[in-house]
Amino acid sequence: QPGYYLAGGSAVHHATEVYDQGADVTTAVQAFHNYFDEELAQRPNAVWRAAGRKTAQWPQGEDDKWWRANGPDMVRKYAQFRINTNGTFPIWQTEAGLEGIELPVDPEFTGGIVLKGYIDRVFALQSDLVVVDLKSGSREPASALQLGVYAVAMEKQYGVHPKWGSYYMTRKGEMTPMVDLSHYTEDKLARWFRNFKRAVEADIFLPHVTSMCSGCGVREACYAYTPSVAPDFSFDSDLATSHDTKENQ
C-alpha cells in the first residue's frame, strides 16, 4: 500500500534539487506539483496511506490535500535557507566538476559488498565538508549512521572524508546540529555490512519496531505486525541442533 508521505517526500526532494540546479522558486514549486501528480498517476487504483496526526483542519491526516498545501511551503523554506546560507554553505564540487547535489556513490567494501546511493547535498564549510540528508518527516533521525555511511562512501569514491554531517528538516526549514563523522571508518562499516550480509543469507530479519511503523506501507509483510508471515523455524530446535553439533565435534 503506497504512502502519500513517500510521494510527497520524493516530490520535495526533486523540487529542491531543481532549485539548486538554478531554477527560481516558482519553477521549483511547480516541479513539486508535477512530480507529486505523476507519482499518484502511476497508481490510479491504489488505496494510498495517509500518515500523520488527524486534526480538525486535516481530518484524514497527511493525505494528498495536505501535501499539496504543505509541500510547496517546504520548497519555499528550502529556497530561503539556501539564500540565507549560501555564503556559509556553498555547494561542493568534485575535482571533475560534479556538484554535490544528489551526488552518486557506489563504492565496494571488503567482502564484495557494493553500496549504491545518492547523497542529497554536500556543502563546503571552509576547509571541511558537510554531508546533508533532507528529511521531510516530522521526526529527526535518532542516529547519524546514514551520514557516517555517506562520509565513508565519499572517501572511497572521491578521496575525501567529510568531517561533518547534518539532517535538513524540510518542515522546519533548518538543519539539525552538525555532528562529527570522523569516527566512521571503512573498517567499522565493512564489519557491520558483513554481519548484515550473513544475516540476510541466513534469512534472519529482526524487526526494528519504532513509532514510524504506524505509517509503514509494507508492515503487512513484517512479522512484528503480521504473525502469519513469521519465518518457519523453531528457535529451541535450532539451539538444540547447534548444541548437539558442538558435542559431537
Q: What are these regions, as identified by a protein language model?
A:
Residues 1-4, 22-24, 203-207:
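Short, polar/flexible loop-turn hinges at active-site or ligand-entry regions and domain interfaces
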Residues 4, 8, 67, 71, ...:
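Hydrophobic (often cysteine-bearing) scaffold residues that line and stabilize catalytic clefts
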Residues 96-103, 111, 141-144, 154-249:
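Metal-dependent nuclease catalytic regions and adjoining charged, substrate-binding loops involved
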Residues 95-149, 158:
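Non-catalytic protein-protein interaction segments used by genome-maintenance enzymes to assemble
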Residues 18-22, 152-157:
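Active-site catalytic microenvironments for nucleophilic, acid-base chemistry
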Residues 11-14, 145-153:
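Short amphipathic alpha-helical face segments that pack within enzyme cores
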Residues 2-16:
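Gly/serine-rich nucleotide phosphate-binding loop at the start of the catalytic core
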Residues 15-104:
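A non-catalytic, helix-rich entry segment at domain boundaries
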